[in-house]
Amino acid sequence: MLNSKGFDLWADDYDKSVGLSEEENRYPFAGYKRILGDIYKIIMEKPNVVVLDLGFGTGTLTTRLYENGCTIYGQDFSSRMIELACEKMPGAHLYQGDFSRGLAEELKQVSFDFIIATYSIHHLTDEQKTVLLKDLLAHLKAGGKILIGDVAFSNRKALDQCKKEYADEWDNDEIYCVADELRTEFPNLIFEKKTFCSGILILAGENFVLYETIGLEGK
């Protein structure tokens, strides 16, 4: 697993690394652009929203949201990633911190229409994911949603099948979301499968009005 300095070193080449895997439709980034595009469409259905991005990296998705009028908050534990993102989004509120330990102090008093995490939450253990998601639900505005785009699977069998197929490339330091298992703690969780190894997980806050899902292939 990369630490904060490891991500600093990777930052300049991150987008290129993602692109190679995505174009070849291979684990781990198969469907990457589609997932970011679908999350973007969901958010842009609602005007003047406040968005928190956890693990925003170089700001690939949040930059598009920022340019289209969203108020952007973010937390990342790489100072270099923050530096790159600030160049693209000078008016965004970006903070350094390890979100496996919770939100940065500056974010704890803010409520959000959307909280997003794209290809970042897999660095947390299952227990840390549960604690974080419960905390994040408390920071949603009425009708708000958590959107997680990542390497993810509908069930353990699908994960094991992917792990077997990509045994030489599998990252054992990363802990991927399994929708069926997360529903033990979050029974209303929705999983939109996008590829054999990726999808979007959706958790809603109180007074949630369900948006029409985009490209739903399976739960």
Predicted regions and their residues:
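An acidic, carboxylate-rich microenvironment
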Residues: 128-131, 181
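Class I (Rossmann-like) S-adenosyl-L-methionine-dependent methyltransferase catalytic domain
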Residues: 1-43, 58-106, 147-219
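A short glycine-rich, Lys/Arg-flanked "PGG" loop and its adjoining helix->strand segment in the class I
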Residues: 130-142
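Conserved class I S-adenosyl-L-methionine
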Residues: 48-55
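Short catalytic micro-motifs in class I SAM-dependent methyltransferases
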Residues: 119-120
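A conserved beta-strand element that flanks and buttresses the S-adenosyl-L-methionine
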Residues: 116
